């Protein structure tokens, strides 16, 4: 019995371990909580803006937010794709190569973040006009957008390090960093919005400074000597081959992020058409709660992916089967629980954001009761996409994400209202998750022989 067990401490978990349900939950729990805190950024902004600033400004924030996520989504691509590559290299016993690849990913993230910042600030106004922002919303969209986009590089770094901290066997450090970033955002929201009355500019600045904490603290950690599996090299590098491979492999996460943002824009367009600004506000509340619920599935996927990549790289196919079986069971179990919670708590969730407006509250509560059924299969679909990314099959992962978010959901948002009116918009996501689950199951069965799970 080792010293840790004699002292009553839990044995540290390694990527090379065999994983029971308890061990799997223990390892992924920090990344799950980490993603929940990350999702709270927008939620806290929304709470303060809706209750302190006003309904029109709340609609403006929700309207421009998808475009901001498109820019920052490249961080998810680099993080998930790069982590799969680095974890496989660690599984093959090549730590030096893993560190060099890791350094290239971080260097590329910073460079791309700066480029996207310049582009985003330049085009934010015409994009908002093109997407149909009302005259009352346009200035709020531009103010919130420009300030938030200024922090794109930090936002991308935060997304990248969320994945790499799990691969470095430091998920608890990732949790600490994200909690610190979330608390920074929440406290500054209170100061800038409720205290200084800076409105949307204050909300955006609070979010941006929170992202600086989330992006810079891990950067400092990996630049200094540390006891993790990964270490940034002193000299920045941009090795094109692994960068392209990581981007290709992680394209599903980028695709999912962009597609989600595009579909959100489509939702806003349809809601403005059918019921006006109140529809956009109601959808914003749904998105905030969905951010938190889906963060559980995304956090699990981020946490389990380096384990999958490691065992695939080590050719331990027995453990690969074990990870798949347990992960699918967990995803479906959590899906049932989240669906039940969402249906039962639709009223309280709506009241927190829009309790000040009776008609908007009624609309939001009804919408959420329909929207809630989507949580049943969402976690399964997210895991399946992440599973194929971890195996290095970015094409299948991207196809699942593309069909799930863009094709199935976009077509449902357009077609269902023709038959079900406004309720068709709220049912669209559930229909898309059902169709995506069929596709995900087909790919899992079709690829069994190739990946030996």
Enumerate the predicted regions with their spans:
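N-terminal transmembrane alpha-helices
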Residues: 16-52, 66-81, 85, 89, ...
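Short alpha-helical transmembrane segments in multi-pass integral membrane proteins
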Residues: 1-28, 86-153, 195-251, 308-374, ...
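Transmembrane alpha-helix boundary and packing residues in multipass membrane permease domains
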Residues: 31, 35, 47, 84, ...
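Residue-level hotspots within pore-lining transmembrane alpha-helices
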Residues: 37, 41, 71-75, 115, ...
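Transmembrane helical elements of multi-pass membrane transporters/channels
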Residues: 26-45, 147, 158, 181, ...
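Helix-terminus/linker motif at the lipid-water interface of multi-pass membrane proteins
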Residues: 40-58, 128-135, 191-198, 254, ...
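Small-residue-rich hydrophobic transmembrane alpha-helices
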Residues: 58-118, 155-174, 282-346, 378-400
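Short runs within selected transmembrane alpha-helices of multi-pass transporters and secretion channels
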Residues: 79, 147-166, 174-185, 203-218, ...
